[in-house]
Amino acid sequence: MSKITPRETEIIGWMAAGKTAAEIGTILGISHITVNTHIANAKARLGIFKDTALVAAALRNGIIR
């Protein structure tokens, strides 16, 4: 899981809290498209296809709590 960036980790944390890409974008002051790009990049690096699997992997590996 160390392959993901600090920004991707931050976004995954917000995903785990139930926030949408639009809500995360507002919180972080970035576009929802940029949020979706970060999510897609993290999933591609880890070979994960679903958002829920990304959050589960981050929780399982102690990246987020």
Predicted regions and their residues:
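Short hydrophobic/aromatic patches at helix-to-coil boundaries
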Residues: 3, 61-65
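Regulatory hinge/linker segments at domain boundaries
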Residues: 1-7
